[in-house]
Amino acid sequence: MPINKSEKPESCDNVKVVVRCRPLNEREKSMCYKQAVSVDEMRGTITVHKTDSSNEPPKTFTFDTVFGPESKQLDVYNLTARPIIDSVLEGYNGTIFAYGQTGTGKTFTMEGVRAIPELRGIIPNSFAHIFGHIAKAEGDTRFLVRVSYLEIYNEEVRDLLGKDQTQRLEVKERPDVGVYIKDLSAYVVNNADDMDRIMTLGHKNRSVGATNMNEHSSRSHAIFTITIECSEKGIDGNMHVRMGKLHLVDLAGSERQAKTGATGQRLKEATKINLSLSTLGNVISALVDGKSTHVPYRNSKLTRLLQDSLGGNSKTMMCANIGPADYNYDETISTLRYANRAKNIKNKARINEDPKDALLRQFQKEIEELKKKLEEGEEISGSDISGSEEDDDEEGEIGEDGEKRKKRRDQAGKKKVSPDKMIEMQAKIDEERKALETKLDMEEEERNKARAELEKREKDLLKAQQEHQSLLEKLSALEKKVIVGGVDLLAKAEEQEKLLEESNMELEERRKRAEQLRRELEEKEQERLDIEEKYTSLQEEAQGKTKKLKKVWTMLMAAKSEMADLQQEHQGEIEGLLENIRQLSRELRLQMLIIDNFIPRDYQEMIENYVHWNEDIGEWQLKCVAYTGNNMRKQTPVPDKKEKDPFEVDLSHVYLAYTEESLRQSLMKLERPRTSKGKARPKTGRRKRSAKPETVIDSLLQ
């Protein structure tokens, strides 16, 4: 039962963080790499130790839930994803995303092997869970489920379900809706099989590639969004709509070029992937740091889309995937540190009741209107159906209340026709046509007139039938989109839902048993400590103190090692930021050099006054650019070539092209200047030419 609008609870929860460690793969076994990760599922700890000869103590991290190499897909789903999806079905926003180094099993955790029920990942299992909940809902509850699928490839948002996957989409933001993707396609689904087909279609369009660390490496971040709208009657007697959004995110893995061997396009992709993941880490750090006043959500498309999921209106679960090999020791430690930091992010989730962008209420309204039209029947004028001439006599009536009389006449001339009535009218038309053919005493003109009248009535009847059928089809299509609670929609997903339920019950029993064992273990440890405190001699006391001292010394060395690693990591981040600043400074100086040498200062100031930064597309834009340059030149009238410009200068003798023919013509046309009286100069002033102009030109050209 939904709550009143005035009572919207706000759930303040931390981001749930779980860690999953995959087993050693065949390549790592063939290279004889050792296992450096130990998983204690009962205590929820991950211990990483160096396998070389160094005396560095192992590092231990504690999380909400941890999964070892032998963990099952169903267990991962029931312990981590099920609570999030239950919250989404109640109207909250939810986000589940996998984070970690490339090749650690993020895509397997999120998608799995869909052909095998036991190996399906979080996304396919959520399909059966959602429609299983709808099938168990009350009969007066209405649901609308729609999905969308996008990827972020090289910092470009692409629609994996659209016709053109290379088209770049824009990220927009509205106060009432929040961050959204403009022109992103969404499809209404009726069962889990529809969802699975759409996901398969989008997965085929996703960018993948091979590297040295992963044969099927994801080269983009993918976000599969499920929007669930639910309409039911509230305590005030009115229908309320709740809308929950579930974002299922499969992130591309962070890479080191030396290990992946990425070159060319793969290297460019890796650079963009690392940049967005670095921004994600900066966002996590800023949210955890209480002194930070700015969270850099806008520095990356990924963090912009996950803005609500990290520190906003969402219940979020982060699954950090790690590899067990000592070869990936540094990457494993980095992933665990980020995950450990993300535990402290606080989200404020609330139920989305009666949102403005809900489609369920709009569909229900259209269905009611269509049902009303079908019950009342199509309105066809009386003259079109009966062919009576009463309306013809009334058409000439004009009075002071002519408009009202016309309206009454129109209402009286309209009839409501049901499907049964249409059948009767069709039969009547057929009878009249037969009777018309049997009457031989009618004149040809009357016969043609009667036949035309019958054809007109038949056309009107056919049109009414087509409109009725169109309304039925439209109503059927809308009713298919709106799912009624309590209807069995599982179909093939019924087996998967059964597996999930059995696994959930088994997990409950195991959880109770683990809790009991944990309490017993704590009691045993407390008893051991009490026994150790009771010394019978000074020698035993010295041994006990020495053991405690060694334990404290180990903890001290671990803390120092952790501090040294953090300082080294911090120094690396500072050096990376400084290198970015130096690169940006070089690019800025180059741009300023070009601008100062090619654009006058006055025009620079004019451009600066009319330029603004577009946050949505990440580019500078000029105001009123539609009224400048080529856009205005297209509208400039072309002058008439016949009218000669009085100020036009004759440039016919100028050498526009230095060819032999043009040079010869220019010299032949050139005339000697005349005196002021208009008389030619005396012949004595001329010199005798030794050669013809053609020969001079030829010699010059040679």
UniProtKB/Swiss-Prot annotation:
CDD domains: KISc_KIF3. Residues 355-593 form a coiled coil. It is found in: Cytoplasm, Cytoskeleton; Cell projection, Cilium; Cytoplasm, Cytoskeleton, Microtubule organizing center, Centrosome, Centriole. PROSITE patterns: KINESIN_MOTOR_1, KINESIN_MOTOR_2. The keyword Transport does not apply. Microtubule-based anterograde translocator for membranous organelles. Plus end-directed microtubule sliding activity in vitro. Plays a role in primary cilia formation. Plays a role in centriole cohesion and subdistal appendage organization and function. Regulates the formation of the subdistal appendage via recruitment of DCTN1 to the centriole. Also required for ciliary basal feet formation and microtubule anchoring to mother centriole. The lineage of its organism: Eukaryota, Metazoa, Chordata, Craniata, Vertebrata. Belongs to the TRAFAC class myosin-kinesin ATPase superfamily. Kinesin family. Kinesin II subfamily. InterPro entries: Kinesin-like_fam (IPR027640), Kinesin_motor_CS (IPR019821), Kinesin_motor_dom (IPR001752), Kinesin_motor_dom_sf (IPR036961), P-loop_NTPase (IPR027417). Pfam families: Kinesin. The modification Phosphoserine is found at S690. Residues 372-424, 667-702 are annotated as: Disordered. One of its GO terms (molecular function) is ATP binding. It comes from the Eukaryota. This is Kinesin-like protein KIF3A. Residues 675-690 have a biased composition (Basic residues). GO terms for cellular component: centriole; cilium; cytoplasm; microtubule. ATP binds at G100, Q101, T102, G103, T104, G105, K106, T107.
